[in-house]
Amino acid sequence: MPGKILTRPNLSSIPLSTMGEFCFQTAKQFENRICHIDAITNQHETYFGFNQRSIRVALAMTKLGVVPQDVVVICSTITLDTPVPLVASFYIRAIVANLDPSLSVRQTSHLLSLVSPKIIFVEEASVNLIEKSLLEAKLETEVVVFGESEKYKTFSSLNQPQTNEHEFRPKSADVEETCILIFSSGSTGLPKAICHSHRSFLTASYNFYKSGSKFDTILSFSSFYWVSAMIFLVTSFIHGGRRILCGSTVKPKQLFHNIEKYKITFIFLAPVLTYGATNFPDYKNYDTSSLYTVLCGGTAISATQLRKVHTVFEHSDVIFAYGLTETGLLTLFDPTTDKELITRKIGCCGKVTFGCTLKCQIVDVETNEILGTNQKGEIRLKSSTMMKEYYRADSSQDFDEEGFLKTGDIGYYDEDECLYVVDRLKEMFKYLSWHIVPTAIENVLFEHPGVKEAIVFGLPKNEEEGEVPTASVVLEDGCRVTEKEIEEFVAGKVSDKEKLRGGVYFVKSIPRTPTGKVMRKKIRDDLIQSLEINKS
């Protein structure tokens, strides 16, 4: 069957405004509603209070010399304070970029070097991380601490009444101007900063808002490092909804308690987080009838596990979606129109969202031929939510000759134009829902004087964890070192998630193609086969 283009028209109701103008206007509109609640302390804040604090911090940042298109970085778990400098940056046309406190110094310093921030807002517990990272990146950046500090300015010192705050209005700008940088690994393996404009990100948020779910009360526990957390923030502003904040992690008992207490209507669970919920024996003791939608995505999840999620959250639509940091959500089911498909097509990623055009060119990776129904190939797409570019980096190689983004994901669509994603072309893999970039760990391995060659890949562990980082290593002649010593050497230089949990395996040579390219898949498959033989 010949290939075709899957497409859905744009929404017509998206406001043509900057993110600052949007947040300011909606905060005024819903000023008496609760904006967010800290589930740990039970403190809450209205949209009026949040807007007032954002204005004060915006004016304070201006006094510190922040000008339009300067980069402002936030490194913190999510609290009532965390989104204030984010929205304040929108108000003064600064560009926002976010880091996660669990990243290593090596990762953080690289990301900081990509964007050269003017100012960094950091939680008290992560000041040491930022100090070391700035030193390694050779950057001199203003540091502001959420909490107490004798060395740096504090967030509370910026959040003070300003004489002209009542007259404040957000700075106007071209809606195509970059306002958000979101870090992603990219298909080449090295992290990049993805540029989203006011238009692209507001469009992505409105598309999500119109997806048929109820966003009255969103449970939020990931940092703004993740694009999903940013979209949930903007989505809640659209209709004056509230977000329930519960730190960086949520245990199963807390999850069900919060759903019942705050009458949560929407949650997003990365597949790895669903296992805690489905393995929690007391889930029936909690009232989850308010929960309209459970959205899953980011990594693969089996149909078996999705059915378990359906069973635990019996009142909810459990939807598995597909999206990219470069675009936001691209395919998902609408619970108001696709009820039957949600239950019948377990494991499907849904249909294309508003403003998305998708080739299921799908594309044959060898011939570039556009494929048809139920034929697997690379997914390529265009979207009204597409990023502008990579910050200070060339992105031309990531698009084909027709302007479609080459996702590096393998998938197919069926006779109902529903998308399935089945594999990745990219060399990176995911462990506990986190992207692991092989080259980043390989660079650490090469710092060891005894390592001549090294290849890192993901070794399948189990459905919950995904793939664990594993290395095949060729030693220098005469080198006497053990696999355990190499593992410990790497562990001391990378984040916890990058540790070589799959082990280090010494080999005599690394197989390559006639053109000299490393045959990473063959190395991985040979090791898996060898381990299976040894088991038997």
What do the PLM-derived regions correspond to, one by one?
Residues 202-217, 225-266, 280:
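Conserved AMP-binding/adenylation subdomain of ANL enzymes
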Residues 40-44, 58-103, 221-223, 435:
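Conserved AMP-binding/adenylate-forming
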Residues 31-32, 150-151, 162-183, 190, ...:
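Conserved pre-ATP/AMP-binding loop-to-beta segment of ANL
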